[in-house]
Amino acid sequence: MIRSILFFVLTALLTCGTAQAQGKGFGLGIIVDDPTGISTKLWTGKSTAFDAEVAWSYDQDEFLYLHGDFLFHNLHLSKEVKGKFLTYYGIGGRVEFADSNKVGLRIPLGINYIFPKSPLDVFFEIVPLLDLVPETESDLNVAIGIRFVFGKGSSE
C-alpha cells in the first residue's frame, strides 16, 4: 500500500503539467462539505498548491476536523471562458478529533475557476477517502467552495 502511494506521488510529480495556472497568492474562504469549514489555498508554483480545511462543532457532537492536500493543476483554455478553468488532483491527509478519532488519506479530484480581474475563485471536488485509524474504511466526500485570493496579480 505504501509503495502504491509513493508510486502515485512520484508519478504525479514527474508528469505535472507546466501550464501557468495561478502561480501565486493565498486564498481564504468557505468550503461546504461534511463538515463545512474554512478553506485555505497557498500556491507554491505555477501549477502546484497546498490546500487545507479546518472545521469544528461545539453542539452535541463536538469535533475538530483538519485536512491538508498537495495539489497539481492543469490549465484548460477556452475562448468562451474569460477566466482560468483548472482541473486538479492531489494527495493529502485528514484528522478528525471526535468521539471516535480518525486519521486517513485523501485523493482530491476537482475543478477550479479563477475569475479574471477579480480576487475570487470557486471550486468543486470529489474526494475518495481511506481512513486508517481507528480502522480501515473508505468513504467519498463531495465539496464546493469559494475563496478570496490575496496577492493575485491585477492583470489576471
Where are these regions (language model features)?
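Positively charged n-region of N-terminal signal peptides that target proteins for export
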Residues: 1-5
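Bacterial N-terminal signal peptides
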Residues: 7-16
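Short loop/turn motifs that connect adjacent beta-strands in outer-membrane beta-barrel proteins
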Residues: 20-25, 47, 75-86, 116-120, ...
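Transmembrane beta-strand segments that form the barrel wall of outer-membrane beta-barrel proteins
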Residues: 22-34, 44, 48-58, 87-97, ...
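Residues that define the transmembrane beta-barrel architecture of outer-membrane proteins
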Residues: 24-26, 34-36, 48, 62-66, ...
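Residues on the lipid-exposed face of transmembrane beta-strands in outer-membrane beta-barrel proteins
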Residues: 30, 38-42, 52-54, 68-74, ...
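Predominantly the C-terminal beta-signal and adjacent terminal strand-loop region
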Residues: 63, 116-156
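Mid-chain, well-packed structural core segment of small domains
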Residues: 80-122
